Amino acid sequence: MDLIRGVLLRLLLLASSLGPGAAPLRSALRKQGKVGPPLDIILDALNCSAFSIQWKMPRHPPSPIMGYTVFYSEVGIDKSLQERSYGVPPGLDTPTSGRLDHQMIFEEVIGDLKPGTEYRVSMAAYSQTGKGRLSSPQHVTTLPQDSCLPPTAPQQPHVIVVSDSEVALSWKPGESEGSSPIQYYSVEFTRPDFDKSWTSIREQIQMDSMVIKGLDPDTNYQFAVRAVNPHGSSPRSQPSSTIRTARPEESGSGRYGPHYATDTEAGEDDDTFEDDLDLDISFEEVKPLPAIKEGNKKFFVESKMAPRPNPMTVSRLVPPTPASLPTTAVAPQPTPVDRKGKHGVAVMPRLFDTSCDETVCSADSFCVSDYTWGGSRCHCNLGKGGESCSEDIVIQYPQFFGHSYVTFEPLKNSYQAFQITLEFRAEAEDGLLLYCGENEHGRGDFMSLAVIRRSLQFRFNCGTGVAIIVSETKIKLGGWHTVTLYRDGLNGLLQLNNGTPVTGQSQGQYSKITFRTPLYLGGAPSAYWLVRATGTNRGFQGCVQALTVNGKRLDLRPWPLGKALSGADVGECSSGICDEASCINGGTCMASKADSYICLCPLGFRGRHCEDAFTLTIPQFKESLRSYAATPWPLEPRHYLSFMEFEVTFRPDSEDGVLLYSYDTGSKDFLSINMAGGHVEFRFDCGSGTGVLRSEEPLTLGHWHELCVSRTAKNGILQVDKQKAVEGMAEGGFTQIKCNSDIFIGGVPNYDDVKKNSGILKPFSGSIQKIILNDRTIHVKHDFTWGVNVENAAHPCVGSPCAHGGSCRPRKEGYECDCPLGFEGLHCQKAITEAIEIPQFIGRSYLTYDNPDILKRVSGSRSNAFMRFKTTAKDGLLLWRGDSPMRPNSDFISLGLRDGALVFSYNLGSGVASIMVNGSFNDGRWHRVKAVRDGQSGKITVDDYGARTGKSPGMMRQLNINGALYVGGMKEIALHTNRQYMRGLVGCISHFTLSTDYHISLVEDAVDGKNINTCGAK
């Protein structure tokens, strides 16, 4: 604008200096008149600190337009003091005159304004005649501050080390994305041992996970993330945990791929500032950002099309203003090259005649130069597919189409030796299956596996010559094959389908291979350059079902769920496998392999299509069927906060798998019991750190084992069979565990959702016959509420061997029958025909009474009981009546033996009285015992021993009980007696009298009983 004013001033001075001869010039200037105001002015508030102004040039200007000026000031403030102006000089593409120039739309963005403030705006054009007429003032108000909030900080990023120079980074958005959707993320890093500030990677990352390359080997790093929306950047996230890149000898990795500038910055929370560092850092985005999935989001900040219907639009962007809004660039239409995948999904990359510098690919795709056909192609990112890469593809068994590939971290600890097993199905005679090497072009060290004319070729080079090992048999197209590669130094081996191994040897003396590139599966982005090394420049066509490297099976799903870091144009081999599945009775279909499925049958159904109904007795779990069962916690979570104990009897068929698992959705709390490498592991977390207890000895597979795990506060105990008990402690200061999920048995519904430190990797394979939680038995028939593909184990109890309503009690590989009253024998097959006058009890026997005349004599303010008994066991219950279920400080009355002594106990609601007569009353002889209570006072007399007395604490005097009366034992005795007694009487009872004169016929008056036989001699 100063330039324009200077030109006009010099013209006027020149005219005046010419004197009278200049009159015609001055007259000509006056005749031309002032330029009119710009037309069709539109104001629009963009954000809190900027507005846009659009206009058309004045109609029929008398002379060419030399520029525009926008005048703006706050409404309500003295205009002469506050008015500001912004000059718009003419650009190369700015029309200045012409018949159609008035149709052009101009746009400018005015920034650095106050939030929520009303501005008065007008503008004028400049020409040779000077400033034109001002437009009529218009008003515009910037958006209020609360509508222009930046995002909150993302969650703490999770980092895993990929190699000596690479890490994989993932994160989740923060609590709020601010007032507008997140546009991109920025990543920062620091080296705690060297740096005093954070270095920013100057890239706009439109993902929520990435692989960062080019880091220093054997170096500590921390990473942080910021989220950016149109209103600004979030604070820095909580820094990641400190990780250390691998040493070069541990893991080869190259600094490959595009490199990007870095920026060392000092933020609001930094104490120091350093100059930019010349760090060679690159990144690879591996997962699309959900907020920008649709359409082409490749942003161009150079221009912005005005949102007007007129096709002729000129636009500019003011660089300092943060209000610029990016637009979608339109890519040229590619040459149509179509190929349909196995299930009809278009997968052939689009071919362009232009180079990647000029090609604009759609969102979720990237450009690669095509050296074979010329031009370039847009490839879909891993997990994306379809014509415009807009379809989500869930990848479990990757499908390749000749131009696809998947990348994994470079081969680790493999420079001297490695073993790789691959299960695949080929659809074409040629194609690259595996490649990993020193560089992307096959020069120097490498290994590869390729299908060449239906033969498999395993090649490797230690640096001085290539070994080529060719399978003796050819593969069958469309059939599944398993190939194993093994190399140790110069020597290599290839084995196809368990056939005769073929061996070979590389040339020269070098025996180690440096691996720096990713491990490529199904092809490689540089396959064109690999033909000399690998024998083919074609990608693999077909499916891969399993890949195992050095004994560890790789999860082929995209990271972070699996190990696949990136890829191109990958499909899912099992897609559509369930379309024609017929799972009935509530079963659901899922792919079990690349070309087969299983039905997830609900509890009580089994079979290929869940067609077979059955009664579950002894559950059998199978990893191949994704089995699991679930049961709710018997009581509220508060009952298990500080103490829990599980007793489990199980038979493992595999060295790994989850036995029990439960967790809290709102915290880090969990507990898990796993088979891990043949050992039992008990893991638990109170919210501040995980405790891990591991059995000292491995378990014998195919045999029954007894397990007991307990936790008191943050202390745990693990006991397996007769092994030495293992004790351990959880980390941190928290001491309680709250689990609001069900208890999962034998597996879980989703292995991706388990707690990070739970150790849960796969389902349990084997049988579980008993689970007891805090003395409460978890019954398969009644307590298992849901689950899938749980079948019956091969166990005698499955065949219901107990007759006449007897219940089968499994005892590892054997069993016992609990017989109802009136039956006896190994299988309860024998009816008791004679009346039982003196019942015999076996430790798991009992008699139950619910007659009101009996019950009222064992309650109230007074009680009087007499019994004659004999026993050979030191411990056993004689009599019990209490609330059902028992609660803390519940009323009860009991009589029994503990370590040979007789104990009379009762609680009236204010505390327990326990009166004991010491002795050895388990001598097998008959003894008489009398227990009397009058209010709080109690007395017990045994044989001719002197009486022992006692008194209950507190003020309560009445015995208020709602439960039945049990003699000789009871159901779940440890649970219902709060562990006062662990077993019933082993012996006989001949007399039972209440209230001194109310004689009870022990068997005849009983309403129920178990395992009652006739005692021998009186």
Swiss-Prot record:
UniProt-annotated stretches for the region Disordered: 228-274
Disulfide bonds: 356-367, 361-378, 380-389, 543-573, 578-589, 583-599, 601-610, 797-808, 802-817, 819-828, 988-1015
GO molecular function: calcium ion binding
Secreted as UniProt keyword: yes
SUPFAM superfamilies, per database record: Concanavalin A-like lectins/glucanases, Fibronectin type III
Major subcellular location class: secreted
Gene3D superfamilies: 2.60.120.200, Immunoglobulins (2.60.40.10), Laminin (2.10.25.10)
InterPro entries: ConA-like_dom_sf, EGF-like_Ca-bd_dom, EGF-like_dom, EGF_Pikachurin, FN3_dom, FN3_sf, Ig-like_fold, Laminin_G
One term under GO cellular component: presynaptic active zone
Signal peptide region: 1-23
Compositionally biased spans, kind Acidic residues: 265-274
Record's keyword terms, sorted: Cell projection, Disulfide bond, EGF-like domain, Extracellular matrix, Glycoprotein, Heparan sulfate, Proteoglycan, Repeat, Secreted, Signal, Synapse
Location in or out of the cell: Secreted, Extracellular space, Extracellular matrix; Synaptic cleft; Presynaptic active zone
Sites carrying sugar chains: 47
Domain Laminin G-like: 395-573, 618-797, 836-1015
Pfam families: EGF, EGF_Pikachurin, fn3, Laminin_G_1, Laminin_G_2
Post-translational modification: O-glycosylated; contains chondroitin sulfate and heparan sulfate.
Domain Fibronectin type-III as annotated: residue spans: 37-145, 153-248
Keyword Secreted: yes
Job description of the protein: Involved in both the retinal photoreceptor ribbon synapse formation and physiological functions of visual perception. Plays a key role in the synaptic organization of photoreceptors by mediating transsynaptic interaction between alpha-dystroglycan and GPR179 on the postsynaptic membrane. Necessary for proper bipolar dendritic tip apposition to the photoreceptor ribbon synapse. Promotes matrix assembly and cell adhesiveness.
Assembly behavior: Interacts with DAG1 alpha-dystroglycan. Interacts with GPR158 and GPR179; transsynaptic interaction is required for synaptic organization of photoreceptor cells.
Name listed for the protein in its UniProt record: Pikachurin
Organism encoding this protein: Bos taurus
Lineage: Eukaryota, Metazoa, Chordata, Craniata, Vertebrata
